[in-house]
């Protein structure tokens, strides 16, 4: 997409939305880490420190994510004509996508509210289960943002120098054989998810504590 420019894609840093998204991901990672500590470490001093750091990290995340989401919904996008394949600019394209896909819109709102609920669980209720709400909400929100960027005849990776070279679901898909193989392999995903769930549940069955770490045969 940036092959004609000498910056090799680094000029994407000039787009404030990219900076806002990067900061939102950074602070969200810190928020999820703090919520994980609060849930899985049985030490009151660490719980209190995590809760204290959660305040400003959560505030920074909410501020940067809201700014990113607002600028995204108000930004122009690139629409694909399904008949001719021609790509043209469309104002408020991503907002139009959400309105055209009500299920995605509802799931996006649910994901955002779930993340906020997880943060509130740790901040105001002093609960330890905030990571479950925030983690599930993060997965749901990211999925909906990806669907908003690529579905509804949208160029998900637009070219700023040659719009007709933008990447879409139509022109970036693999061959029929590759898609067939990938669809077969994707049947393994539930087993992989179940394995990950089992391993993490086994690891987190007992909270980490000073006494637990003092054992020679601890499970870590």
Residue ranges and their predicted role:
Residues 1-2:
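Short, small-residue-biased leader/transition segments that mark boundaries at the very start
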Residues 9-28, 95-113, 172-192:
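Hydrophobic alpha-helical transmembrane segments
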Residues 10-64:
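Loop-centered beta-sheet repeat module
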Residues 34-53, 71-90, 113-135, 152, ...:
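Juxtamembrane membrane-water interface segments of multi-pass membrane proteins
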Residues 57-71, 133-150:
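Hydrophobic alpha-helical membrane-insertion segments
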Residues 59-68, 72-87, 94, 98-99, ...:
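Hard-cation-handling environments
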Residues 87-91, 157-178:
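Short, membrane-exposed interhelical loops at transmembrane-helix boundaries
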Residues 142-164:
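Juxtamembrane non-transmembrane "cap" segments at the membrane-aqueous interface
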């Amino acid at each position: 997409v940036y092959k004609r420019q000498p910056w090799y894609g680094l000029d994407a840093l000039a787009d404030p939305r990219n900076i806002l998204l990067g900061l939102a991901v950074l602070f969200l990672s810190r928020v999820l880490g703090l919520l994980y500590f609060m849930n899985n470490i049985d030490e009151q001093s660490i719980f209190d420190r995590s809760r204290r750091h959660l305040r400003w990290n959560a505030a920074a995340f909410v501020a940067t994510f809201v700014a990113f989401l607002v600028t995204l919904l108000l930004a122009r996008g690139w629409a694909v004509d399904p008949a001719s394949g021609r790509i043209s600019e469309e104002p408020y394209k991503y907002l139009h996508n959400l309105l055209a896909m009500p299920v995605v819109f509802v799931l996006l709102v649910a994901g955002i509210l779930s993340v906020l609920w997880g943060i509130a669980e740790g901040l105001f209720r002093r609960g330890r289960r905030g990571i479950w709400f925030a983690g599930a909400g993060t997965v749901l929100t990211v999925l909906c943002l990806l669907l908003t960027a690529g579905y509804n005849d949208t160029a998900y990776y637009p070219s700023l120098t040659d719009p007709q070279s933008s990447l879409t679901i139509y022109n970036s898909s693999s061959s029929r054989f590759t898609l067939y193989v990938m669809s077969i392999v994707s049947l393994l995903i539930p087993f992989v998810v179940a394995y990950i769930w089992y391993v993490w549940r086994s690891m987190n069955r007992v909270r980490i504590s000073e006494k637990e770490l003092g054992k020679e045969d601890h499970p870590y």
